[in-house]
Amino acid sequence: MDHDDLLGAYRRLRLLREFEERTRLEFQTGQIAGFTHLYAGMEAIAVGVCEHLSDEDKIISTHRGHGHCLAKGCDPAAMMLELWGSTDGLCRGKGGTMHIADFSRGMLGANAVVGAGAPIAVGAALAASMTGASWVAVSFFGDGATNIGSVYEAMNLAVVLKLPKIFVIEDNG
């Protein structure tokens, strides 16, 4: 990475942290309904991975998906509108904080079920393999998902079929 790449990565790190700080404040004042799980403190993981992905590559996130969305290039204003429940949000206000997605950026969605993104991302990787597409699928999940059977089944299938798949385990606890 050259100086400009490093500066761009730093700016994305700051964007992720500032977005999470704003999200925390909006949640505390009741502007964001339901639950919210912040990604603050883990920004370097998402930025470090997504920095090396193409626009065509796909990602699947967790219930802590804001950072992954932003690192993949999703629009922060549209994301905040989504968290507020606005019909102008990324998912028309229906996805909220734990189910946010932006297919146009390769963000196939966040999933509130622990470990559920790994098999979904393997399905995306299988689609790439079967159609001859050149993109890879990345699933992010926390260390708590490493005791979920479907995560290991997804890993096994990805290896057996030699799929274009990356598993990112985040120590978030």
Q: Would you name each region that the model predicts?
A:
Residues 169-173:
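Thiamine diphosphate
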Residues 1-8:
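Charged, compositionally biased N-terminal leader segments and the immediate start
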Residues 21-25, 29-161:
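Cofactor-binding active-site loop characterized by glycine-rich and histidine/acidic residues
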